[in-house]
């Protein structure tokens, strides 16, 4: 079953094994994922479950969204996500939490990376930079040539140049679930995950582990 959950990044810490080995972990708070719609092949052409998490003020909810949430008899959430479903059944109003994962399981975590603003090619693309001396002045961190001459007479698409860095959708694959705290709805995942503390995260079973 490929269903995932939506959570928040609570921060990083470390835990120790019985042998005294320190493991860096990210704490992910899995808020109750409320099912807003269950899609089937007969009605929608594919099987999926749609969920919402968190809360949103009524003044921030459109009439269409309010009707959709009311039909499912759930409170309006801050975001809506959909997960493909290979097996199993869900009903509108059901709750999905951290218990669908187990310690030792591999997961993929998706989030929005931290925004870095406008950055040059050295920070953004790891360019090496030019000489500090030997006749070079005021060109130490410039990218250099960005193309050829009259032929082709343009800069190719995808050329690595200065620009906005970060604030992108990033997925880190095959992270190990070290511990599941069902009482507090927490997942402890080995290693770092994208985004700032408090940011939304989507946790799914690892695609590569599914074969």
Curated annotation (Swiss-Prot):
Methylated by PrmB. The keyword Lyase does not apply. The modification N5-methylglutamine is found at residue 150. It comes from the Bacteria. Gene3D superfamilies: 3.30.160.810, Translation factors. Keywords: Methylation, Ribonucleoprotein, Ribosomal protein, RNA-binding, rRNA-binding. GO terms for molecular function: rRNA binding; structural constituent of ribosome. SUPFAM superfamilies: Translation proteins. Signal peptide: none annotated. Belongs to the universal ribosomal protein uL3 family. One of the primary rRNA binding proteins, it binds directly near the 3'-end of the 23S rRNA, where it nucleates assembly of the 50S subunit. This is Large ribosomal subunit protein uL3.
């Amino acid at each position: 079953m490929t269903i995932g959950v939506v959570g928040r990044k609570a921060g990083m810490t470390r835990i120790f094994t019985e042998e005294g080995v320190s493991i860096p972990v990210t704490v992910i708070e899995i808020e109750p994922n409320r099912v807003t719609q269950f899609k089937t092949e007969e009605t929608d052409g594919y099987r999926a479950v749609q969920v919402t998490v968190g809360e949103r003020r009524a003044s921030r909810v459109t009439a269409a969204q309010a009707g959709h949430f009311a039909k499912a008899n759930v409170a309006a959430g801050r975001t809506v996500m959909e997960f493909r479903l290979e097996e199993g059944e869900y009903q509108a109003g059901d709750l999905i939490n951290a218990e669908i994962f187990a310690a030792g399981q591999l997961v993929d975590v998706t989030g929005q990376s931290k925004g870095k603003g406008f950055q040059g090619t050295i920070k953004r693309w790891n360019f090496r930079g030019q000489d500090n001396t030997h006749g070079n002045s005021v060109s130490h961190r410039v990218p250099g040539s960005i193309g050829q001459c009259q032929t082709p007479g343009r800069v190719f698409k995808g050329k690595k140049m200065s620009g906005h860095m970060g604030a992108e959708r990033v997925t880190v694959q095959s992270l190990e679930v070290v511990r599941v705290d069902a009482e507090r709805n927490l997942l402890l995942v080995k290693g770092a995950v994208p985004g700032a503390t408090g940011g939304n995260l989507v946790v799914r079973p690892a695609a590569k582990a599914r074969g």
